[in-house]
Curated annotation (Swiss-Prot):
Gene3D superfamilies: 3.30.1320.10. HAMAP family: Ribosomal_bS16 (MF_00385). The lineage of its organism: Bacteria, Bacillati, Actinomycetota, Actinomycetes, Mycobacteriales. It comes from Corynebacterium glutamicum (strain ATCC 13032 / DSM 20300 / JCM 1318 / BCRC 11384 / CCUG 27702 / LMG 3730 / NBRC 12168 / NCIMB 10025 / NRRL B-2784 / 534). The keyword Ribosomal protein applies. This is Small ribosomal subunit protein bS16. Residues 151-165 have a biased composition (Acidic residues).
């Protein structure tokens, strides 16, 4: 009996999920299977590929022929290299980053809320008006300091004139 390792399609129209199965070569794509050895989800980022390496090695050793798609998956997981005795048996499988738990996200948001807002919640018009007001106040303060400095310079001259007289 000719045995193939092939993909059995599951899922809705635009969301395919596949099972990696061992089946007779003459059966339909979604027909009766001998054994289910893994899953493949191409729509996830990165793609989810889970294949039982031990069972894949067994079926390859007894002569099961993988389809082109399954052969590509076996190369990614490193099972094909292990079977052929080629270097690079670790494969090139990408692993998704673990999602942070909801409790961690909640605690992080809570700490950010306690620290206060990181950016000012002021519109551009109000911000510009406030900057103009601050600039006017700074100019008035500078003018007042200049006037006070000028008066203090004039005062010693008047005192010196009073002493001479």
């Amino acid at each position: 009996m000719a045995v193939k390792i092939k993909l059995q399609r599951l899922g809705k129209i635009r969301t395919p999920h596949y099972r990696v199965v061992i089946a007779d070569a003459r059966t339909k794509r979604d027909g009766k299977v001998i054994e289910n050895i893994g899953i493949y989800e191409p729509k996830a980022e990165p793609s989810v590929i889970k294949i039982n390496s031990e069972r894949a090695q067994h079926w390859l050793s007894v002569g099961a022929q993988p389809t082109e798609a399954v052969a590509a998956l076996l190369k990614v997981t490193g099972d094909w290299q292990k079977f052929k005795g080629i270097e690079g048996a670790e494969g090139t499988l990408r692993v998704a980053e673990p999602k942070p738990s909801k409790l961690e996200l909640f605690n992080q948001a809570l700490s950010e809320a306690n620290n206060g807002p990181t950016a000012e919640a002021i519109t551009e018009k109000k911000k510009k008006a406030r900057e103009d007001k601050e600039a006017k106040e700074a100019a008035e303060k500078a003018a007042a300091e200049k006037a006070a400095a000028a008066e203090s310079e004039e005062a010693p001259a008047e005192e010196a004139a009073a002493e001479e007289a």
